[in-house]
From Swiss-Prot:
Organism of this sequence: Lilium longiflorum
Protein name, UniProt field: Profilin-2
One Gene Ontology CC term in the entry: cell cortex
Main localization category: cytoplasm
Record InterPro entries: PFN, PFN_euk, PFN_sf, Profilin_CS
Function: Binds to actin and affects the structure of the cytoskeleton. At high concentrations, profilin prevents the polymerization of actin, whereas it enhances it at low concentrations. By binding to PIP2, it inhibits the formation of IP3 and DG.
Entry keyword set: Actin-binding, Cytoplasm, Cytoskeleton
Summary of subunit composition and partner proteins: Occurs in many kinds of cells as a complex with monomeric actin in a 1:1 ratio.
Amino acid sequence: MSWQTYVDEHLMCEIDGQHLTAAAIIGHDGSIWAQSESFPQVKSEQITGVMNDFAEPGSLAPTGLFLGDNKYMVIQGEPGAVIRGKKGSGGVTIKKTNMALIVGIYDEPMTPGQCNMVVERLGDYLYDQGF
């Protein structure tokens, strides 16, 4: 299965009639493995900041989490495993696996819990597969 298939069928899937706004699978080095058409153009330093926050939880909190031109307020996640951000009525969930970051961006009416479930379920599966 291609990485794009994981994005299209497992991240951008329908959950209770709702979909993520955008999603991507990004290597720890910042390389894009696959992304939805709507995923923002991220800068390498933004991925470096995310990786630093996984290594030192809380390092993004003072500045916020940036993905492309969007700034998210960092909210409670799981140190070293999941980063969550909020922006208005939407937000982002980032799950770290052995080799990649699974990123899901949502907006109302999708809920944070639905986004977390979609992103973390795929992240846990890929982690268990060695990715």
